[in-house]
Curated annotation (Swiss-Prot):
Keywords: Activator, DNA-binding, Ethylene signaling pathway, Nucleus, Transcription, Transcription regulation. It comes from Arabidopsis thaliana (Mouse-ear cress). One of its GO terms (cellular component) is nucleus. The lineage of its organism: Eukaryota, Viridiplantae, Streptophyta, Embryophyta, Tracheophyta. Belongs to the AP2/ERF transcription factor family. This is Ethylene-responsive transcription factor-like protein At4g13040. Its main location: nucleus. Residues 217-226 have a biased composition (Acidic residues). InterPro entries: AP2/ERF_dom (IPR001471), AP2/ERF_dom_sf (IPR036955), DNA-bd_dom_sf (IPR016177). The keyword Ribosomal protein does not apply.
Length: 226
């Protein structure tokens, strides 16, 4: 509401006791936006008493809205200020790095062919054959080549009804059919233990021959003449 003094200063009143010209009616939308709407003014043209009451009601509604918005902003600020860095850390989930399993890789020697045979693995610079029976790993033997270890595994695989690496001959199949599993293991261990001393003896003989000096050809011819 504009005071009488302000209206006189603005030129709305004529003389000291002039008639106060009524202000034009403004709807709530016009009061908020500040843009006059001629359609709304033509549709609604109330009397002076109704105009005053509607303006008061609309002014109260605007004040109520502004008060609610201020209270919401104050409530939001208070809630935001109450959150400390410790609380924010406790609210946010703790970062846990993904667990990675260790990959056990076998050491490979230079110029070593990979283990492509079933039941064969490389350990202690030698090829070893093994088979798993009833959740137990049974060591069959140690060999210098991968093929020898695979051949022994094939015999054990035939006894257990598994797929071999190579095709077995009829003679070997006939021999294995006459043995039980325990007899096969005992026979295999016996052959491995019998092979060990021979290989050691041959290795020692080669060492002795290499250490002995060779006689020259002239001495050999003289000995033949005598």
């Amino acid at each position: 509401m504009v005071s009488l003094r302000r209206r006189r200063l603005l030129g709305l009143c004529c003389g000291p006791n002039g008639y106060v010209t009524p202000l034009p009616f403004l709807t709530a939308e016009e009061m908020i936006t500040g843009i006059p709407n001629p359609n709304a003014r033509a549709a609604y043209n109330p009397g002076p008493a109704e105009t005053v009451t509607t303006v008061i009601v609309e002014k109260k509604a605007i004040e109520e809205r502004s008060r609610r918005t201020r209270s919401k902003h104050m409530h939001f600020r208070s809630d935001y200020s109450d959150i400390s860095p410790v609380n924010s850390d406790s609210i946010s989930p703790k970062y846990q790095p993904p667990k990675r399993r260790k990959q056990h890789r076998r050491k490979r020697v230079h110029n070593q062919e990979p283990c492509l045979m079933r039941g064969v693995y490389y350990k202690n610079m030698k090829w070893q054959a093994a088979i798993k029976v009833e959740k137990k790993q049974i060591h069959l033997g140690t060999f210098s080549s991968q093929e020898e270890a695979a051949r022994l595994y094939d015999r054990a695989a035939f006894m257990c009804g598994r797929e071999p690496n190579f095709e077995l001959s009829e003679e070997v199949i006939r021999e294995l059919k006459q043995q039980s599993w325990e007899e096969f293991l005992n026979c295999t261990r016996r052959t491995i233990t019998n092979k060990k001393p021979k290989s050691r003896i041959e290795h020692e003989d080669t060492k002795i021959n290499a250490s002995m000096p060779h006689q020259p050809e002239e001495e050999e011819q003289d000995s033949d003449k005598m």
